């Protein structure tokens, strides 16, 4: 039959040669070739053992192919580079400065996994890392959460990256890239002897104690620049013999400062991203932030005592062609409205603006730069809310009340009016934000101006020549806030400034003879302590050399003393 030499089983020699055919032709084809061996993704490409301090070396690829890298253990690749100056896989020239530290994530069992989806890595997963951060991901996670949404940010530290920064470690569709038979050091049988390893500067370094692979890479880079070997980190405590003892300095731990306008509840983004697939995943809960202006308004309207509320008041002078109008602005009850008026006044928006509407016995209205009654914008460029419904809001209960003009709810702009009498029907419709405290005669003159027949426009122009802000509670608040933030600042520059200021104060408490003065108020404090001591029961005698005059003793009948209730003290002794 011509096949009587073929056996019905695979012989040992065929197994040893890596042949899977029983024919002599197949045997001859496989002669001289070793079996395909794939490097596991979690092993060093040089020692073939699981890595502890992984670093990557980017390999050159053909045009159109995705960039890829080989992974080594730091303590294995550095001695090899020092001896052969080449890449163990490709044989191309290589320096230690080209090593990239990788940040793998491990679960409780010690298995490598994706840091976002927690999917355990396997030989069938496309594993990549970002060149600029070194963080390792599953390519599917990176594609779904960073590339497809076009955010192009690292999923761990939010650093931006580009497509060229994505480097492949393992591609299941490209097995040849991890074939051990094609590695340069395998073909040429290149090794680092034990004697050379013993003399290597990294021998004996505890990488974890030195701060990880990044710290060792930094030490190597410094060595390459200076030409000196990095000093190994001692693994045991020195006995200190022959060395000068050094005092340890414990650095103060910086306290993470919370933003002054942070709320006591979270923004809800983490919960929303967990329950909604349309949102980007959020792994950190953050506090919601109050708007800075709204927070300022809340702080100014918080005081309840009259003395504290006076700090929230603003004062201004409205100069007209009829005379001045001095007003008090209620920043404690209508802070947003007062802030709008103060900022417009400081910006000169009311300069040369007329009071366009006058109704004797009712009110006079102005604040419209167009002079028509249909214009005027707020400080923010859009209408803002009313404040007549706030707790403790002022009412239209007297002459000279300063209130906001509007065309309906939440339509406040720049126009305002003064009342000529109590107008309670305007309560709940217009926000009262001030009152007249000086210049009543000016208001009387304005009220006596005639109006055009059939209308309410004054015959004679009533012009606002300017508004001068005499007291601004918002500036005072900002100054207090900046001072508080400066005291709470934990930056290096702030701490240095405080230390220098403390040193200057210490100098002021030292005389030119070198003696240090006591603490301020220490003498008075000591006297107070002496006054409340036992010595208060001792009567102080007269001056030295003077006799004390004895009182005349009355030998009459001794009066019965009433018993005092309670134990009392020793003052009667």
UniProtKB/Swiss-Prot annotation:
What are the EC numbers? 2.3.2.27, 5.2.1.8
User: Does the record's keyword annotation contain Nucleus?
Assistant: yes
Q: In which pathway does it act?
A: Protein modification; protein ubiquitination
Region annotation Disordered: residue ranges?
223-247, 489-515
GO terms for molecular function, please?
Answer: peptidyl-prolyl cis-trans isomerase activity; ubiquitin protein ligase activity
Record carries keyword Isomerase:
yes
Catalysed reactions listed for this entry: [protein]-peptidylproline (omega=180) = [protein]-peptidylproline (omega=0); S-ubiquitinyl-[E2 ubiquitin-conjugating enzyme]-L-cysteine + [acceptor protein]-L-lysine = [E2 ubiquitin-conjugating enzyme]-L-cysteine + N(6)-ubiquitinyl-[acceptor protein]-L-lysine
Q: Which InterPro entries match?
A: Cyclophilin-like_dom_sf (IPR029000), Cyclophilin-type_PPIase_CS (IPR020892), Cyclophilin-type_PPIase_dom (IPR002130), Cyclophilin_A-like (IPR044666), PPIL2_U-box_dom (IPR026951), Ubox_domain (IPR003613), Znf_RING/FYVE/PHD (IPR013083)
Q: Where is the composition biased (Basic and acidic residues)?
A: 236-247, 489-510
In what residue span(s) does the PPIase cyclophilin-type domain sit?
312-469
Keywords assigned by UniProt, alphabetized: Isomerase, Nucleus, Rotamase, Transferase, Ubl conjugation pathway
Where found, per UniProt?
A: Nucleus
- One Pfam family hit: Pro_isomerase
Q: Name one GO biological process term.
A: protein ubiquitination
Residue span, U-box domain: 37-119
Question: What are the GO cellular component annotations?
Answer: catalytic step 2 spliceosome
Q: Which family does it belong to?
A: Belongs to the cyclophilin-type PPIase family. PPIL2 subfamily.
User: PANTHER family, from UniProt?
Assistant: PEPTIDYL-PROLYL CIS-TRANS ISOMERASE-RELATED, RING-TYPE E3 UBIQUITIN-PROTEIN LIGASE PPIL2
Please describe what this protein does. May catalyze the cis-trans isomerization of proline imidic peptide bonds in oligopeptides thereby assisting the folding of proteins. May also function as a chaperone, playing a role in intracellular transport of proteins. May also have a protein ubiquitin ligase activity acting as an E3 ubiquitin protein ligase or as a ubiquitin-ubiquitin ligase promoting elongation of ubiquitin chains on proteins.
Q: What is this protein called?
A: Peptidyl-prolyl cis-trans isomerase-like 2
Species in which this protein is naturally found: Cryptococcus neoformans var. neoformans serotype D (strain JEC21 / ATCC MYA-565) (Filobasidiella neoformans)
């Amino acid at each position: 039959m011509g096949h009587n030499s073929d056996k019905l089983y695979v012989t040992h020699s065929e197994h040893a040669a890596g042949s899977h055919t029983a024919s002599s032709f197949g045997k001859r084809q496989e002669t001289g070739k070793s079996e395909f061996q794939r490097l596991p993704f979690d092993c060093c490409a040089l020692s073939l053992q699981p890595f502890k301090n992984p670093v990557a070396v980017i390999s050159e690829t053909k045009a159109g192919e995705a960039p890829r890298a080989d992974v080594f253990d730091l303590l294995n690749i550095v001695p090899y580079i020092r001896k052969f100056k080449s890449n163990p896989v490709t044989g191309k020239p290589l320096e230690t400065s080209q090593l990239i530290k990788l940040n793998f994530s491990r679960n409780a069992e010690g298995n490598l996994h994706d840091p976002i989806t927690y999917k355990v890595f396997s030989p069938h997963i496309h594993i990549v890392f970002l060149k600029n951060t070194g963080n390792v991901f599953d390519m599917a996670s990176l594609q779904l959460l960073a590339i497809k949404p076009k955010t192009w940010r690292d999923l761990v530290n939010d650093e931006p990256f580009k497509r060229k920064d994505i480097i492949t470690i393992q591609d299941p569709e490209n097995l040849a890239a991890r074939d051990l038979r094609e590695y340069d050091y395998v073909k040429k049988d290149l090794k680092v002897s034990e004697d050379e390893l013993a003399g290597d500067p990294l021998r004996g370094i505890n990488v974890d104690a030195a701060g990880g692979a990044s710290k060792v890479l930094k030490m190597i880079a410094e060595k390459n620049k200076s030409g000196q070997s990095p000093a190994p980190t001692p693994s045991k405590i020195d006995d200190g013999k022959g060395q000068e003892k050094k005092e340890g300095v414990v650095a103060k731990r910086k306290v993470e400062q919370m933003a002054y306008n942070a709320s006591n509840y979270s923004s809800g983004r983490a919960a929303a991203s967990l329950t909604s697939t349309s949102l980007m995943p959020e792994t950190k809960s953050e506090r919601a932030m109050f708007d800075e202006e709204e927070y300022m308004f809340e702080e100014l309207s918080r005081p309840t005592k009259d003395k504290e509320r006076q700090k929230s008041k603003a004062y201004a002078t409205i100069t007209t062609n009829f005379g001045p109008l001095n007003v008090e602005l209620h920043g404690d009850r209508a802070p947003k409205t007062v802030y709008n008026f103060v900022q417009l006044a400081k910006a000169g928006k009311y300069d040369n603006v007329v009071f366009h509407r006058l109704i004797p016995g009712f009110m006079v209205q102005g604040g419209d730069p167009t002079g028509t009654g249909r214009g005027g914008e707020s400080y923010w460029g859009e209408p803002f809310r009313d404040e007549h419904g706030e707790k403790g809001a002022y009412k239209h209960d007297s002459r000279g009340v300063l209130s906001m003009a509007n065309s309906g709810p939440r339509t406040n702009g720049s126009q305002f009016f003064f009342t000529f009498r109590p107008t309670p029907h305007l309560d709940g419709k217009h926000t009262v934000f001030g009152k007249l405290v000086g210049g009543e005669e000016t208001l009387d003159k304005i009220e006596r101006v005639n109006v055009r027949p059939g209308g309410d426009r004054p015959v004679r122009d009533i012009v606002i020549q300017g508004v001068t802000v005499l007291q601004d509670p918002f500036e005072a608040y900002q100054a207090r806030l900046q001072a508080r933030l400066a005291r709470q600042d934990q930056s290096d520059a702030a701490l240095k400034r405080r230390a220098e200021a403390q040193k200057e104060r210490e100098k002021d408490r030292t005389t030119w003879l070198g003696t240090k003065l006591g603490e301020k108020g220490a003498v008075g404090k000591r006297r107070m302590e002496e006054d409340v001591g036992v010595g208060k029961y001792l009567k102080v005698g007269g001056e030295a050399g003077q006799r004390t005059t004895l009182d005349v003793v009355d030998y009459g009948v001794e009066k019965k003393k009433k018993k005092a209730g309670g134990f009392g003290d020793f003052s009667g002794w």
